[in-house]
Amino acid sequence: MAGCLVTGNEDGAHSCVAHVLWAMQEFGFTIPPNVNAYWVNKAGPGKSYIEAGGERYLYTNKTLFNTIYNLIFFAKLLKQHPIDTNLLELKELAKQESEPEE
């Protein structure tokens, strides 16, 4: 199970989240929907998250709560219904449907 929390502004945060979550799923993590949160502030230098009162910022808190609750929900779901995929069996099925490799 994985989610992503980053600091930064809109475009940079989206790019970071996309790369991190893609990499995590490549390692076998389950990625539920809407499991990223970031702080949106004015672009450029300025106050830090804490100095600007970021912990009271509605958008950040909304996406953070979405992230937390979706991660918890899917963790419970996977605990009750584990994914029992056998990758070796799937590889053999794929071989049967494929042209022989040279």
Question: PLM ranges: what are they?
Answer:
Residues 1-27:
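Helix-loop-strand module that forms the ligand-binding subsite of alpha/beta enzymes
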Residues 25-102:
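Glycine-rich phosphate/pyrophosphate-binding loop and the adjoining helix
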